[in-house]
Amino acid sequence: MSIVLSEHVRQQAARRGISEAIVWAVAEAPEQVVQVRDGREVRQSRVPFPPDGMMYLVRVFVDVSSDLETVVTIYRTSRIEKYWGIA
């Protein structure tokens, strides 16, 4: 399946200091996938961010209800333990 980024996601990523390379990496090869509802999943990975290498959880929300997988929103959080491993 092909993955596409919405313009909204591109704007969010830029505003939140998340490179498109990170968005693509997490969307294509996440450490975890969490089904949040029918047709929507969260793909997430732990990623170090400069300048100090602090570890954040990058959460990529993907609409998987069609032939295209569309990334609809993205954010990063330092509260890894809150979201890591939830099912």
Located regions from the model:
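Ribonuclease/tRNase effector modules and their secretory precursors
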Residues: M1-A87
